[in-house]
Every structure is written in structure tokens, then in C-alpha cells.
């Protein structure tokens, strides 16, 4: 997952929205506020800009009560809060966490893990080794790190196969091996409780030990009942030479009842007398407290206390304080709820905390070095990490392997406290003796095994019977073959399913393809022959569609067109005869094998299969569209000059394509020149292969081919019964010979024979004499003519294979490679005289496009400003002593928006502003901007016009008000669109703001006042300030104004304002303003009567 700062555009979008909600402060205040916010945001640390890195903590927190005692949410909260406050960690991101409950069944746990992949940036877990490898592969696919404390799978040690996986603790197997090697205990037994997570753990532990060459005698599962425990212990006693018993279950010291019962029964069966040593596996995953920590379960159960004398507890070494002390200190600081007692919390709490800190340390290293962190780089930068965790020192070496220290704890049958005996140094993988020796029952450890078990590069037989070993190997081989066969079957089924539903699906529908006008679907035309453009139909409320500038205007459908667009590329559809195909499942089940085989065909000279179209009763093969049309089209086009080198290159492409098909045991059966297409690079590709196979599989009838269609068919196939779709490799060779004749003479098959096609077919079917085309010698080299005659031999067995054809064809150029480039260069020399005209034509087109671009730029910015920006010059702010500004907005726009669909609001504003834009074109004004329903126009800038600016704005306002009186919304025609207009004159400063999408903006108190004139105006009214009225009266052009009175303008106090109601000579009708209420005001929204009328019409339409 790539980590980068939060896009600034998101902040701008939020800020603009806030500005619109506070529009009453005016544009200048809005701009000032925007600048202040920009300065504040730019000063914020990177964590404010960047999205949080969310860590998913995965474990069986709800289905296993002992796992739930780890309090994962509190541990994750404590770690993330400390990390986010830690000044030494410069992560560039704030850390967050999310708790994912892992089902206790591995299969369901994997399913839930997959469903969580979009909810987190990285994962701590899983806790169940049963799906660790799958989770790691998924994490690699998602580019999300998997940091596990429980995965024991030895396959995960491969950094190449699992680049996004890392362990936050040393591998438990490495720790066990270090201890076993020191005491020379090679023969092990593994026993687990019957919970699924521990069953999978047991099998992974056994598999990992066996991968290191150690003999694991038994792998057993037991419940809490006495019968299953006794049976399991008896099996261990019967196994050969077991020294160490690894218990994969919850430790009895933290409440594991199964282990308690197991040790009690082992004591009763006298298995705790020193013959065996019992090692709890789960204590390898956390730091078990032992310093001054009595355990009640040992004190209250004498039998268990005696049995525990045979137990060696291996756990992560604590530092200055135990887990309980660290927990109580955090509670005292208020970081953890004080109501939680430390002895009620599982030490796994610290492991979860350390894992989150482990990710933070890796991210800190990655950000320091690269400035960003992906999942793989997080794992890479988890090397050489050292930090103090919850109460442990966490370390890794240069390879990323954990080297945190472990301690071996022991007790005797008299005590209920644990004491340290050995320190397991994982950096050197050696044991260091402590102050107290291990107290083994009977005074001595279990008997040591041969040293060879731990010697690298040596095979230790260990008393295994060679015959038994051979039988085991054979059994494993049979099992492996069975598994491979089953896996192949499953993979085959998955491939079939993916053909229909996966990202590689090949059954397409109308939702996947867009058909192009049928005028061009009648034959394989080139891209250049079709001119199409996207026509926007936003005003009509419809989605954009394709329209064509030439040819038929008949709408393109799957029934009348063979050309379509799929994923941005042009494709060609070869339709099958109409028939009853049934549903999509029936097509898939009967033809999926052929679909898969055709999909796998990949060669430069094979037109690749894109898929199969099946919709609306149409079934078709979908292949890539080749712009040079078919070989038949090229041969018939006399404008294309073909020398022999060019022809031989096309023939060689055909030979290589057919050679590939025949090597894949794929007979074409329909080979002809029109089934050979040529792409834009003049590479010939074979297409329409597999057509007959699908016809047979789907049992589709086919129309009797015409005599012209049979001219490429081999004689033996022509003589077959009617209706049969025979095809053969030799028949393809015959078809190739006919294509050679077409290429040599640039004519149709048998074009030199003055006979109808039907009679030619009859002569071919009934020799003697053998009837074949006659090709004059001057059309091709003699050896090519000879090859052609061999290929159309009457006896099929006498025809060469395409391997032989290929070998002969290579020798025809006397050692020279058939290079179509040389031929094309000669063609270019012939056409070089036309290049100057072509360049001139393109230059003129470029100039036209340049003019269009400049015109568009001048529509967005004033011409002088646009010219300065094009030259790369700085646009200095310009002051204007006196201009007139126009503001207007739609009354009740919020209500209209709430009652309308978003596209209807867009249509409304587009229709209204299009109307306004047409009006301002006849006045000397400049449109500044539109924001939502607000429309801003100025006169007197950027081009000064003396005192005319007030008259121009006043005339434009009257025209706009008159046009709005008759304007109707398309979706709400019964609701009137009322606007209110505000005018004000005064000085402003204009300048260009921003580098990306620069805007021409106005600044000054005049902008504020004009906005206040609009916001304090009334519907269907032109609210004019005193300064504007003074200018209008000075001009003396007969403007009619009415005194409104003194109006409260926010930030300006009370000022005298006026209504502009007309002008002498202005004859256009103006809408009648709504009546003024008793308080002298009218509503600034829609009337209830108008809303009710719209709702009644909407209800009727829904009926």
C-alpha cells in the first residue's frame, strides 16, 4: 500500500463548500479566509495531511475466552496512542487500529480475513497458523504487510515468496530447536487441544520440525475428557523414543483447563517421572511473568504442582519489570481502565502491543530512508530493529529474523513460583546458564538422542526400518500424485468458472461492449474509415452517445453491426447462425473446454480471441479488430502496391500462424483469404479458427455454403456428405495453396478459369482430370509455384505439413530473411513526393486547432491576461477607479435542489447560465465567474469604458430580468425561477490567482457591497446602490428608478438604496415581483402553493 500525503484537492473542496455555506460574508472575506486557512494548513505537520495508517489486529477474540483476555482493543489503543505521541517516531501518518475477530475454524477465518482486506493498511496476525501462508500470499497481492506473532509455518521463511510477511517475534521453531539441540532431544511428540487453532498449530509445528530433519513420532489431538486424554498419552508412551512433548494449547498458568487435565493424567500414568519433558507452546508467544509472581493454580492443586516439575516453560524474557508491573503502571497513568486487574489479563496483551510498535519502528525507518512505505519496504525496514516494548526488548537481525531473548523457567514440586534457569540467546542460538539449574524429576533430564540429528548435512537413520521407510515414501508418492490430480481438477474447474465470472472472463454481454454504426459493420473497415465523436446530450437528460459523421445514421445494435468497442479497443464479432442457445450456463457447460483452448492460443500471427458475445439471442466470436482489413481486401485494392517481397512476407506470416495452430492440434477448417486479417503493422493474422468446433459442440445448424465459399475447400472434404463439418490438417494445406494463388496473381480463386464457381466445384470433386488454377510463371519464383502445386495435391497424404512448408519457404530467398520492412521502405520512396503535401495539410490542421485553443483560453481569461500567461510573464494586479458590478442568485435554490435530482440541478443551471451568456454577449461587460447559483458580471474592466459601465450593467440587468420572466425549468415547469439582482459601482483591484487553473478575480469593498445588494434584494427586483444611481442619472439615458429607502447592509450600516424598474425605450416585458408582506419583505424561498403544485404533478406521474 503506497503511503502519501492526503490530496490537497480534498481540503480545497471542503473549504469551498464551507465558503458557500457562509456566502453572506462576501467574496472578499471568503478570499481572505481562504488565504488564512491555506497558511494554517501549510504549517501543519505531515500527519495532518496524510491518511491514517490503519492496522488490523486479527485474532479469535470472541470465540476463545482465553484469547479475549488479551484485551486486544485496549492493547492496540495503548500502543497507537503512545506511538502517535512519540516524537522520536516520524511516521508521516497517524496510526489507527481496527479489531478483526477471527473465527476459530480456519476455513471461515480465511473467508473473514479476505472480507477485511479493504478495511486496514496492514495486519497483525493471523493467530491461526492454518491459513498463515494464504494470508501472506493475499497480503502480497494486496500490497499490505502481514506481521504475525503466531505463524509457525516454515514456508513463510522465504523472503522471495513472501516479501510482505514478517514475524514480530523469533520463530517459535527456532527457539524450540535451540533448546532441543542443547539438550539433544531429537524425538518429539506434539499434542494439541481440540480447538481448530491449536490443531493447525500442532500440525504446523510438526511439519516445521520435520523440515529440519527431526523425527516427530506422533501428532495427537485431545479434548478435556479423561478418555481422550488417556488415549493420547498411551499413544505417546507406545511411540518410539519420544523425549520432548510439545503441548499446543493454552497454558495451565493462564487458565488452560485442557493442559491442567493433561498434566494431571500424565502424573497418574507416571509420565512426569523424568522420562519425558513437557513444553507449553503458547508461552513462546508472550512474556509470562515469573519474577515474584506466585501462581494460584499451582498452590491450590498439589497434583498439578508435582506434575509441573516435568514442565519446562520457555517464554520471552522480561526486562526491568514484569508484564503485571508494566500493566499496573499504565493503569496508574490513566492509559488503561483501572477497573482491570493485571492478573486477569493475558500476557498476550504485551505481544499485541509490541507488534503495533514493531510496525511503527519499521515505518519510521522506511520514511527516513525513502519518504514513503509500501508493504514490502516495511518488511525490508524491519531489519536491525531494536526497541523496548511493553516490558521486553524487541530485536531483529540484518535478515529481519527476531533475536529477542527467551528464558527457560522451571519449578519443583514444592514451589508455586517459577524461576529462571537458562537464557536462550536467539542471536547466537545458544543457551546461557543462569543462577539456578533445572530441577528434573528423578535428578536427570530425559535421555539424549544421537548428535547426528542436529548436524548439518548429515542423515541420521535413527533406527528406522528401510522397508518401512520405502513403504512410507511410496505412500507419500501416491498421496502426492493424488493431491496433484485433485489440484489439477480443482484448477481446471476454477479456470472454467473464471471464464464466465472472473476478471479473465470471455463471455461478454451488452454491458461489456458498445456497438459501432452498422454502416461500418458490414465489412472490416479501418479506423480511418470511421469518423465518430462523442456528442453530449446533457441538456436532454440522456447519457453521452456515439454519433457518426458519415454513413448511415441507423443506430448500432448487436443485430446489425459487427464492430464494437470493448475496454477502449475495437473488436470484430463473427456471428454464429441464429439458434436456440439456451441460457448462459448451458453455453458455458457445453463449450467451456473449447473456450478455454481458444483463449489460450497466443501467437503473433494468430488473431487473439477476446471473448464470446452472448446477448439478445446473438452469439458471436469476439476477436481483435485489424485496421488493414482482410488479406482479400488488400489483394483487391489496386492502390496498394505489392511486390514479391511484400507478398512473401504475408505468406510467411500465414505459414507461421497455421504452423502454430497445427502444433496445438487445432485444424482450422475454414481457411481462406478473407479469414486472414492484417493489422496496422502489416502483420498477417489467422482468424475464425474454432468456428466449426463450436458449431458442433452447440449442435447449431449452418446454412449451406455457396459455391464461391467452397473454392478453398479440399477435394476430399467436398466429397464428404452434405451437412458434415469435416476438417483436417491436410485440408488446411490445400486452402493455403489456393491463398498462394490469390496472392501471386492478386485475384480471386480460379480467376483465370472462365467458369462459374458451381461448375468449378463439380470438376474438383470429380477428377480426372485434376482441376486446379493455372498461374503464369512470371507471377512468382519457380520454387514457389512448385510448392503451391505440392500443397494442392489430389492425395491428401502427399501434401506437405506446415513445418515442411515453413522450412522450404525460408530457403526461397537464398538465405535472406523475408523482411516486410525493406518492402515498405521501397514503397515509402515511391510515395515520398506526397509527403510535403501531407505535412502542409497537417500544419494547416494544427494551426486551426491552435486557433481553437487560443479562442477557448480567451473565453476563460481576458485576452491581455491570457497573452501574458502564454508568454510566461507574471500578471501584475491592476486597479480600476470605477467599475460597476452585477450579482444575482436564484431565490429558493436550496429548496429546488432538495426537490430535484443532481442531474436536474445541473440541467437547470446550464440552461439558465446559457441564457445569461447569450445576453451578455450584446453588452460591454465581462463575466467574472459563477459559483453555484451565483452569477457575477463586471463592466469597466478589464477594458475601461469611461462612465458607460453603469449603463451597460443596467441594460444587461433589464434584459436578464426580462428573459427570466419566461424561463421554465424542464423538470419543474410549474415552479417559477425568480432571481434577485444587486448592482454597485466603485473601485476594485483585479488580478490572477493561482498557478493551476488560474482565475481572474476581483478584490475590494466594492465586491462586498455588490454582494450585499444582491443578498438584501427581493425576487424579480434589481437592487441598485446610491453610487450606481448617481452615475445612471449623470448619463441621462432615462433610467427609471424607485427609492426603496434605507437598507441595512451587513458591515456597512444603513444606506439609501433604489430599485431599477425600467428605462425609456425599453419595451421588453418584466416579470411582476411578488407582493410585499406587512413587514415590508417577501419570502426568500419558494411559496408553499408552488411546492404543492410540483408535488401533485410528481404524484400523478408516479401513478
Curated annotation (Swiss-Prot):
Which GO molecular function annotations are given, in alphabetical order?
Answer: ATP binding; GTP binding; guanylate cyclase activity; peptide receptor activity; protein kinase activity
Q: Where is the Protein kinase domain?
A: 532-812
- Identify the stretch annotated as signal peptide in this record: 1-46
Q: Which GO terms describe its biological process?
A: cGMP biosynthetic process; intracellular signal transduction; receptor guanylyl cyclase signaling pathway; visual perception
Give the Cytoplasmic compartment stretches of this protein. Answer: 491-1103
List the keywords (alphabetical). Cell projection, cGMP biosynthesis, Disulfide bond, GTP-binding, Lyase, Membrane, Nucleotide-binding, Sensory transduction, Signal, Transmembrane, Transmembrane helix, Vision
Disulphide-bonded residues: 104-132
Q: Where in the cell is it found?
A: Membrane; Photoreceptor outer segment membrane
**Protein EC:** 4.6.1.2
How is it regulated at the activity level? Activated by GUCA1B when free calcium ions concentration is low, and inhibited by GUCA1B when free calcium ions concentration is high. Inhibited by RD3.
Question: What are the Guanylate cyclase domain coordinates in residue numbering?
Answer: 884-1014
- Superkingdom as given in the UniProt entry: Eukaryota
Q: Which reaction does it catalyse?
A: GTP = 3',5'-cyclic GMP + diphosphate
Q: Which GO cellular component terms are attached? A: plasma membrane; rod photoreceptor outer segment
Provide the tissue specificity. Answer: Expressed specifically in retina.
Q: Which PROSITE patterns match?
A: GUANYLATE_CYCLASE_1, GUANYLATE_CYCLASE_2, PROTEIN_KINASE_DOM
Task: Give residue ranges on the Extracellular side.
Answer: 47-465
Modification comment: There are 9 conserved cysteine residues in sensory guanylate cyclases, 6 in the extracellular domain, which may be involved in intra- or interchain disulfide bonds.
Q: Transmembrane ranges?
A: 466-490
Q: Which InterPro entries match?
A: A/G_cyclase, A/G_cyclase_CS, ANF_lig-bd_rcpt, Cyclic_nucleotide_synthase, HNOB_dom_associated, Kinase-like_dom_sf, Nucleotide_cyclase, Peripla_BP_I
Q: What is this protein for, i.e. what is its function?
A: Responsible for the synthesis of cyclic GMP (cGMP) in rods and cones of photoreceptors. Plays an essential role in phototransduction, by mediating cGMP replenishment. May also participate in the trafficking of membrane-asociated proteins to the photoreceptor outer segment membrane.
**The family this protein is said to belong to:** Belongs to the adenylyl cyclase class-4/guanylyl cyclase family.
**Record's domain comment?**
The protein kinase domain is predicted to be catalytically inactive.
Q: How does it assemble?
A: Homodimer. Interacts with RD3; promotes the exit of GUCY2F from the endoplasmic reticulum and its trafficking to the photoreceptor outer segments.
- Protein name listed in UniProt: Retinal guanylyl cyclase 2
Specify the species. Bos taurus (Bovine)
Q: What is the lineage of its organism?
A: Eukaryota, Metazoa, Chordata, Craniata, Vertebrata
Amino acid at each position: 500500500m503506497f503511503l502519501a500525503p492526503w490530496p490537497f484537492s480534498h481540503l480545497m473542496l471542503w473549504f469551498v463548500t464551507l465558503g458557500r455555506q457562509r456566502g453572506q460574508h462576501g467574496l472578499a472575506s471568503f478570499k481572505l479566509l481562504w488565504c488564512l486557512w491555506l497558511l494554517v494548513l501549510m504549517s501543519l505537520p505531515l500527519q495532518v495531511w496524510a491518511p491514517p495508517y490503519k492496522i488490523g489486529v486479527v485474532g479469535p477474540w470472541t470465540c476463545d475466552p482465553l484469547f479475549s483476555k488479551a484485551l486486544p482493543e485496549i492493547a492496540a489503543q495503548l500502543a497507537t496512542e503512545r506511538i502517535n505521541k512519540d516524537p522520536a517516531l516520524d511516521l508521516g501518518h497517524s496510526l489507527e487500529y481496527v479489531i478483526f475477530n477471527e473465527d476459530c475454524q480456519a476455513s471461515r477465518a480465511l473467508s473473514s480475513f479476505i472480507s477485511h482486506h479493504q478495511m486496514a493498511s496492514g495486519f497483525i496476525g493471523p493467530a491461526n497458523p492454518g491459513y498463515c501462508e494464504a494470508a501472506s500470499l493475499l497480503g502480497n497481492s494486496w500490497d499490505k504487510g502481514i506481521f504475525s506473532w503466531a505463524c509457525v509455518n516454515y514456508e513463510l521463511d522465504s523472503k522471495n515468496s513472501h516479501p510482505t510477511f514478517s514475524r514480530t517475534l523469533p520463530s517459535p521453531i527456532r527457539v524450540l530447536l535451540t533448546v532441543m539441540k542443547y539438550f539433544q532431544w531429537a524425538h518429539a511428540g506434539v499434542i494439541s487441544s481440540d480447538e481448530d487453532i491449536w490443531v493447525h498449530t500442532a500440525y504446523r509445528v510438526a511439519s516445521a520440525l520435520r523440515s529440519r530433519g527431526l523425527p516427530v513420532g506422533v501428532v495427537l489431538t485431545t479434548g478435556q475428557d479423561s478418555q481422550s486424554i488417556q488415549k493420547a498419552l498411551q499413544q505417546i508412551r507406545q511411540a518410539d523414543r519420544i523425549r520432548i512433548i510439545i503441548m499446543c494449547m493454552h497454558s495451565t498458568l493462564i487458565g488452560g483447563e485442557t493442559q491442567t487435565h493433561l498434566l494431571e493424567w500424565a502424573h497418574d500414568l507416571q509420565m512426569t517421572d523424568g522420562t519425558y519433558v513437557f513444553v507449553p507452546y503458547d508461552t513462546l508467544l508472550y512474556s509470562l511473568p515469573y519474577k515474584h509472581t506466585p501462581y494460584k493454580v499451582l498452590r491450590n492443586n498439589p497434583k498439578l504442582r508435582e506434575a509441573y516439575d516435568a514442565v519446562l516453560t520457555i517464554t520471552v524474557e522480561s526486562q526491568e519489570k514484569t508484564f503485571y508491573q508494566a500493566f499496573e503502571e499504565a493503569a496508574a497513568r490513566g492509559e488503561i481502565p483501572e477497573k482491570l486487574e493485571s492478573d486477569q489479563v493475558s500476557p498476550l496483551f504485551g505481544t499485541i502491543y509490541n507488534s503495533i510498535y514493531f510496525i511503527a519502528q519499521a515505518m519510521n525507518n522506511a520514511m527516513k530512508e525513502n519518504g514513503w512505505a509500501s508493504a514490502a519496504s516495511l518488511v525490508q525496514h524491519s531489519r536491525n530493529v531494536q526497541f523496548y516494548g511493553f516490558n521486553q526488548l524487541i530485536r531483529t537481525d540484518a535478515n529481519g529474523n527476531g533475536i529477542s531473548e527467551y528464558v527457560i523457567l522451571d519449578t519443583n514440586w514444592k514451589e508455586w513460583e517459577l524461576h529462571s534457569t537458562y537464557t536462550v540467546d536467539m542471536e547466537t542460538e545458544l543457551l546461557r546458564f543462569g543462577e539456578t539449574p533445572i530441577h528434573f524429576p528423578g535428578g536427570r533430564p530425559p535421555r539424549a538422542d544421537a548428535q547426528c540429528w542436529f548436524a548439518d548435512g548429515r542423515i541420521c537413520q535413527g533406527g528406522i526400518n528401510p522397508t518401512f521407510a520405502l513403504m512410507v515414501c511410496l505412500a507419500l508418492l501416491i498421496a502426492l500424485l493424488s493431491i496433484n490430480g485433485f489440484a489439477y481438477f480443482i484448477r481446471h474447474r476454477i479456470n472454467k468458472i473464471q471464464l464466465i465470472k472472473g476478471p479473465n472472463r470471455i463471455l461478454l454481454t451488452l454491458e461489456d461492449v458498445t456497438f459501432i454504426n452498422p454502416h461500418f459493420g458490414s465489412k472490416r473497415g479501418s479506423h480511418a474509415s470511421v469518423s465518430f465523436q462523442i456528442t453530449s446530450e446533457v441538456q436532454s437528460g440522456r447519457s453521452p452517445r456515439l454519433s457518426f459523421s458519415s454513413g448511415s445514421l441507423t443506430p448500432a445494435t448487436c443485430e446489425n453491426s459487427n464492430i464494437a468497442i470493448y475496454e477502449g479497443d475495437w473488436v470484430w464479432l463473427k456471428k454464429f447462425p441464429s439458434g436456440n442457445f439456451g441460457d448462459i450456463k448451458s453455453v458455458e457447460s457445453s463449450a467451456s473446454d473449447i473456450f478455454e483452448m481458444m483463449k489460450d492460443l497466443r501467437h503473433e500471427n494468430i488473431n487473439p480471441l477476446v471473448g464470446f458475445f452472448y446477448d439478445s439471442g446473438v452469439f458471436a466470436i469476439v476477436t481483435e479488430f485489424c485496421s488493414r482489413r482482410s488479406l482479400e481486401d488488400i489483394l483487391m485494392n489496386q492502390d496498394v502496391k505489392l511486390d514479391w517481397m511484400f507478398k512473401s512476407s504475408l505468406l510467411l506470416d500465414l505459414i507461421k500462424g497455421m504452423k502454430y495452430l497445427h502444433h496445438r492440434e487445432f485444424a482450422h477448417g475454414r481457411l481462406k483469404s478473407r479469414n486472414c486479417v492484417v493489422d496496422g503493422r502489416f502483420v498477417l493474422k489467422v482468424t475464425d479458427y474454432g468456428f466449426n468446433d463450436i458449431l458442433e459442440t452447440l449442435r447449431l445448424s449452418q446454412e449451406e455454403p455457396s459455391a464461391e465459399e467452397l473454392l478453398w475447400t479440399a477435394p476430399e472434404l467436398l466429397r464428404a456428405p452434405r451437412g458434415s463439418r469435416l476438417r483436417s490438417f491436410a485440408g488446411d494445406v490445400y486452402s493455403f495453396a489456393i491463398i498462394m494463388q490469390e496472392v501471386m496473381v492478386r485475384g480471386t480463386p480460379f480467376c483465370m478459369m472462365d467458369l462459374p464457381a458451381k461448375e468449378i466445384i463439380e470438376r474438383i470433386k470429380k477428377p480426372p482430370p485434376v482441376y486446379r488454377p493455372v498461374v503464369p510463371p512470371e507471377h512468382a519464383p519457380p520454387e514457389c509455384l512448385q510448392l503451391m502445386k505440392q500443397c494442392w495435391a489430389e492425395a491428401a497424404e502427399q501434401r506437405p505439413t506446415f513445418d515442411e512448408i515453413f522450412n522450404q519457404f525460408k530457403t526461397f530467398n537464398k538465405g535472406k530473411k523475408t523482411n516486410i520492412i525493406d518492402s515498405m521502405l521501397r514503397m515509402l520512396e515511391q510515395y515520398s513526393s506526397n509527403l510535403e503535401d501531407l505535412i502542409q495539410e497537417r500544419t494547416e490542421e494544427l494551426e486551426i486547432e491552435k486557433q481553437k485553443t487560443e479562442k477557448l483560453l480567451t473565453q476563460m481569461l481576458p485576452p491581455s491576461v491570457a497573452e501574458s500567461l502564454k508568454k510566461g510573464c507574471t500578471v501584475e494586479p491592476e486597479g480600476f477607479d470605477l467599475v460597476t458590478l452585477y450579482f444575482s442568485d436564484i431565490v429558493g435554490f436550496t429548496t429546488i435542489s432538495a426537490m430535484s435530482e443532481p442531474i436536474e440541478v445541473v440541467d437547470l443551471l446550464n440552461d439558465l447560465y446559457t441564457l445569461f451568456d447569450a445576453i451578455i454577449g450584446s453588452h460591454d461587460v465581462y463575466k467574472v465567474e459563477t459559483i453555484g447559483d451565483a452569477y457575477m458580471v463586471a463592466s469597466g474592466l478589464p477594458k475601461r469604458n469611461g462612465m458607460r459601465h453603469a449603463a451597460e450593467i443596467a441594460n444587461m440587468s433589464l434584459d436578464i430580468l426580462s428573459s427570466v420572466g419566461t424561463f421554465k425549468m424542464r423538470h419543474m415547469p410549474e415552479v417559477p425561477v425568480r432571481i434577485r439582482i444587486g448592482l454597485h459601482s466603485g473601485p476594485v483591484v483585479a488580478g490572477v490567482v493561482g498557478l493551476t487553473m488560474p482565475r481572474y478575480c476581483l478584490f475590494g469593498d466594492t465586491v462586498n457591497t455588490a454582494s450585499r445588494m444582491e443578498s438584501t434584494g427581493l425576487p424579480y427586483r434589481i437592487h441598485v446602490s446610491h453610487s450606481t444611481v448617481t452615475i445612471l442619472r449623470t448619463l441621462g439615458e432615462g433610467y427609471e428608478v424607485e427609492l426603496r429607502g434605507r437598507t441595512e447592509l451587513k458591515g456597512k450600516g444603513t444606506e439609501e438604496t433604489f430599485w431599477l424598474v425600467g428605462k425609456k425605450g425599453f419595451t421588453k416585458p418584466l416579470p411582476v415581483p411578488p407582493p410585499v408582506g406587512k413587514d415590508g419583505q417577501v419570502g426568500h424561498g419558494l411559496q408553499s402553493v408552488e411546492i404543492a403544485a410540483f408535488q401533485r404533478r410528481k404524484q400523478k406521474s408516479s401513478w
